[in-house]
Structure formats: structure tokens, C-alpha cells
A protein has these predicted regions:
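Short hydrophobic targeting helices and cationic amphipathic motifs
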Residues: 4, 8-9, 15-18
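Positively charged n-region of N-terminal signal peptides that target proteins for export
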Residues: 42-45
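Acidic/histidine-rich, surface-exposed loop or edge segments in extracytoplasmic proteins
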Residues: 69-87
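Zn2+-dependent metallopeptidase catalytic core
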Residues: 81-159, 193, 197-200, 207
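Zinc-dependent metallopeptidase catalytic helix centered on the HExxH motif
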Residues: 158-253
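Acidic/His/Gly-enriched intrinsically disordered linker/tail segments
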Residues: 212-286, 297, 305-352
């Protein structure tokens, strides 16, 4: 599910010291003999005062940094966890983030916030979260942060996972915030691992859209879930299936279950038509199948590399045509009118 701030909600070392290291301008002027200050020192002091007045000082000073959005980084992800989250869950999340970043590149800045089942602990984590937001962007209003529409107590109550992409024309800080929880799926469920991969593939998708304009980002990523969620789901399950110790038939089993959603399509409806909401699961499931179908007709590189490389400059439809040789409309028609009518056995042949 996508919220207006670019927040994805997928249905289906814990730093304690959050104080920033601050670099102040304040030089120390020692007392001079006779109480007199040389003219040169007075001039330096005057210039420093002007700098403070012009640019701010201390915690409220935001140092302009080069915009490296979309470039891989050596900066590690940050991990924060509620007090009721076991260290084993933090380590599990780190492990699967590493699998994803090794496969698709390390993009950031990225934070993971891991919520347990205690609403009290989640409220404490919310306060910590808002302190971090204020630290990274002094313009953050704590009241609004603490009372945002979907906070950590919702995750403690309902579970699930999500990505909040912070990239707009208002905020000074751009980055990615992934939230994991203690249920739906929980850390003891196998699905927890591909869900970490799923959320990180959303990071990969958004890292390839440089624009700060909300409408541009929505257009390039597609408003309805068929494309972004289908892509994240298939690529996550595909990568998970290739890991050591995962049973050989895993991917076919998962994808066969997803085909059940084809029976829920309405007459004349395509996955592109289905918005986020109560029927979004159809777009998640069959969107994953559409990406598998697309890759079977081209290649993994055409989807994962070529398309996203061209997306920002060419736009969605031209990047699609360049990468796959046909329009999205034509391939969606083939997918619905031909592929989904094949036998189950024939459909599963495209799954590696």
C-alpha cells in the first residue's frame, strides 16, 4: 500500500545514542594581557558572528551536502529496534538486507526500524524515531511526527512491513525508512526473509527516480501496485529461492499459489486497473507473474538493469518499449488474453 509520503505497506547493533555529532563554529578567544583585543582578532570575531547569523549555529545548522541520490554507497544501513525486539530478529534483518544489497547494490541513506508486539515499546520507539527525524532535518515538527497517520503502534498491533521513501521538495533529508514488525510475518516465519528483500527492492526502484516532484515519482513508479509491488515481490522471491538451503521447488510453489488470484479478476479488468485497497492482493500476485512473464520474454538484465537505467530520462513507457521491445499495453494484453489462459503446467515453465 502506498501512502502520500511514498510509504509502502506490504500485506503479506541497536543504536541507543541518537545525539548527532555536532561541529560548531565557536572558537575560543583567550583573555589578552591588559584586556585589549587586537584589531585583527576583532575583525575575525565580527566575520564569525556574521557567519552564525547568516547560516545558523549548533543543532539548527544544516550543512549542505552533495545530492548522491541513486548512487550506490559505502554507508551502512542504520538499525533501530523497540525494547521488546530480540537481538536475533535484528541480526536476521541485517542478514537479509546484506543479501539484498549484495545482489542489487547498496543504496541509501537507509534506516531499518524494527517493531515488536508491545504497543508501549512501540510508542517509545516512535519518540526515538521522531528524535532522529529532528536530528536529520531540524525543520521536522515533533508534534506532527508523533501523530503521523501510520506509526509504530499500528505495526505493533497489526504487523506487516513497509517502506517510507523520503524524497520531496520540502524535506532537507532524503532517504529510505524500512519498518519490519513482529508478526504478519514474524521473524520465525519463512516469509520474513523474502519480505526484507521485497522492501529493499522498493529501495532499488525508488533510487532510480531522482526527481523530488511527487507526481513525477508516482508516474515513473506507476500509481497502482501492479508494477512496483509485482516487481518487488517477484524479484524478492526469485532472489530468496537462490539462497543456500532454500528447497529446490520453493519458487514454483510460491508462484503457483499466486495464480489463484487470477480467478478474482473481473470481466475485462487488467492488473493495471487495480488500485491499492481491499483487492490489491490480486495486483501483487499477478503483478509478480507479469514480471516473471516479462523476464521470460526478455531477460533479467532487461528488467532489473536496462529498464531502471532508462526510467528517469526516457519516462516509463519509452523505457518499457526500449527494454522489452513492445508497449506495456501490448504485453499486458498478451499476458491477460493468452498467458493466463494457458494450463498451469505451461505457466509454471517460465519459473526458473
Amino acid at each position: 500500500m502506498i501512502f502520500s509520503a511514498g510509504f509502502f505497506l506490504r500485506g503479506i547493533n541497536n543504536p541507543r545514542n541518537l545525539d548527532a555529532t555536532r561541529t560548531g563554529l565557536g572558537p575560543t578567544f583567550g583573555a589578552l594581557q591588559g584586556g585589549q583585543i587586537p584589531r585583527a582578532a576583532m575583525k575575525r570575531a565580527f566575520l564569525i558572528i556574521l557567519s552564525i547569523l547568516g547560516f545558523g549555529h549548533g543543532a539548527n545548522c544544516v550543512v549542505a551536502q552533495a545530492d548522491t541520490w541513486g548512487k550506490t554507497t559505502a554507508r551502512p544501513a542504520e538499525f533501530y529496534a523497540a525494547s521488546d525486539v530480540p537481538a536475533s530478529q535484528v541480526e536476521l534483518t541485517k542478514q537479509w538486507h546484506q543479501v539484498a544489497s549484495r545482489a542489487w547494490g547498496n543504496f541509501g541513506p537507509l534506516e531499518f526500524w524494527i517493531v515488536g508486539r508491545s504497543e508501549k515499546a512501540a510508542r517509545e520507539l516512535d519518540r526515538k524515531y521522531c528524535a532522529v527525524r529532528k536530528q536529520k532535518d531540524p525543520g521536522t515538527v515533533l508534534h506532527y511526527c508523533l501523530n503521523r497517520s501510520h506509526n509504530f503502534t499500528d505495526y505493533a498491533r497489526d504487523g506487516n512491513a513497509g517502506l517510507n521513501t523520503r524524497r520531496n521538495e520540502r524535506d532537507k533529508w532524503s532517504g529510505f525508512i524500512i519498518t519490519m514488525s513482529g508478526k504478519n510475518p514474524g521473524p520465525r516465519e519463512e516469509d520474513y526473509k523474502p519480505v526484507v528483500l521485497h522492501e529493499y527492492f522498493h529501495v532499488y526502484q525508488h533510487a532510480h527516480i531522482h526527481s523530488r516532484k511527487e507526481q513525477t515519482r508516482k508516474s515513473l513508479n506507476q500509481t497502482n501496485p501492479w508494477w512496483s509491488e509485482g516487481g518487488a515481490e517477484y524479484m524478492a522471491q526469485l532472489l530468496y529461492s537462490r539462497q543456500k538451503g532454500v528447497r529446490a521447488n520453493y519458487l514454483k510453489e510460491v508462484m503457483e499459489r499466486k495464480l489463484r488470484s487470477s480467478g478474482s479478476l473481473q470481466e475485462g479488468e487488467t492488473i493495471r486497473d487495480i488500485p491499492y485497497g481491499r483487492r490489491a492482493r490480486i495486483a501483487y500476485d499477478l503483478g509478480a507473474w507479469f514480471i516473471a512473464f516479462l523476464i521470460s520474454k526478455s531477460s533479467e538484465e532487461a528488467y532489473q538493469v536496462n529498464f531502471f537505467k532508462a526510467l528517469e530520462t526516457r519516462g516509463f513507457e519509452r523505457a518499457f518499449l526500449d527494454s522489452f521491445g513492445q508497449s506495456s499495453k501490448a504485453l499486458l494484453e498478451e499476458f491477460h488474453n493468452h498467458f493466463l489462459s494457458l494450463s498451469r503446467r505451461s505457466q509454471l515453465k517460465i519459473i526458473p
